[in-house]
Amino acid sequence: MKEDHFPVTHTDAEWRKILTPEQYDIMRAHGTERPGSCALLYEKRPGTFVCAGCGQHLFESKTKFESGTGWPSFDTPVEGGVETSIDRSMGMTRTEVHCARCGSHLGHVFPDGPPPTGLRYCINGVATNFTPAAAN
């Protein structure tokens, strides 16, 4: 993944100021949070999950489902919200999911999700913030 093609860019020092140490480890150093460790795993209100680094809309809560993995899981991203690349780390080939606006690592996508897409976007909760839908 070429870091300089994203609309939002920062130096490493700037990212370290913007993000918490845990967010930096996951979003910029491609780490993974412990399963079940993020409160957003249990978020059920209507709203939008956005990138913690730049505010890009990533997933709508209506696409979130309980996968039993310990990470927030979604079957469909917001159009244009995420991009993917091949991740060959850890001795396996996976599809990495990153923010389309700032390139931050979000998680991975797997072909074992529910209909209609059959996809499971397995996302590190700490890489997102939740914005509740406006009350009508």
Please give the residue ranges for each predicted region.
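A short Gly-Trp-Pro
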Residues: 6-136
